[in-house]
Amino acid sequence: MIDYFILDKEKKRLRLYDAYREDGFCKCFENIEKIQIEKNSEKEKQTRVIIIETKDSELPISIEIDKDNNIIGYSNLQLTQVGDNFLEYNKQLSELNLPQLIQVGDGFLEQNEQLSELNLPQLTQVGHNFLQWNNQLSELNLPQLTQVGDGFLEQNEQLNELNLPQLIKVGDVFLKLNEQLSELNLPQLTQVGHNFLGCNNQLSELNLPQLTQVGHYFIPWNEQLSKLNLPQLTQVGDGFLLCNNQLRELNLPQLTQVGEGFLE
């Protein structure tokens, strides 16, 4: 047993302990050729490293586990795509190295409690509930990301640094309930869904120069934002800027269509 998976050394396969669950992590280990388990060279860590060689890759995959067999580290240098619910129920992962990852499905690392930094330099597209409820994540760098689904980084209480320079389109509930983020720059963003940046109490600076369309409840219940300039915005839904008590300056030169409860 490792975490909630069964690693079968004889049959050379990894499967879920609960067959009724689905986890994209399992599909990263098809066509296994060799499994080797080693003690970590750093004695104080009291961890072990599982090294897996597959027929599909020249480079080995490594999984680090703690003394209780929880997965705390994962490195796969050639992985480009993962399916839904990747390590969704893992709570102890603190190191993740996926330098070639391009696309992920829904529920990616949804309930992780230890990951504090993450760099996915090639990632371009993610599904719903990406890194949702990750209480320790403070820095995230996704320089190639262009599109995200619903629930992106929802309720990440420690996130204070976010780099998404190529992001163009986001779904509903983007970055809701993020209590530490004070600045956000999304220079290429053009379209957002409902409840964008809801309840971000520390957000005081926001730059969205290309934004043209937003859904309902754009930046509701923000307590710090005093200035907002959206030079390309043409259309907004209901509840635009609901309960933004500190907003003093607003510039929307291209706006032509608004929903109900505008600036309520």
Language model feature labels by segment:
Residues 8-9:
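Intrinsically disordered, low-structural-confidence terminal and linker regions
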Residues 59-60, 67-80, 92-102, 114-124, ...:
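Structural signature of tandem-repeat unit edges
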Residues 16-18:
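Cullin-RING E3 adaptor/co-adaptor recruitment helices
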Residues 22-93, 97-98, 103-105, 127:
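LRR N-terminal entry segment and analogous cap-like coil->beta motifs
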Residues 76-77, 85-92, 103-114, 127-136, ...:
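Concave beta-strand-loop units of leucine-rich repeat
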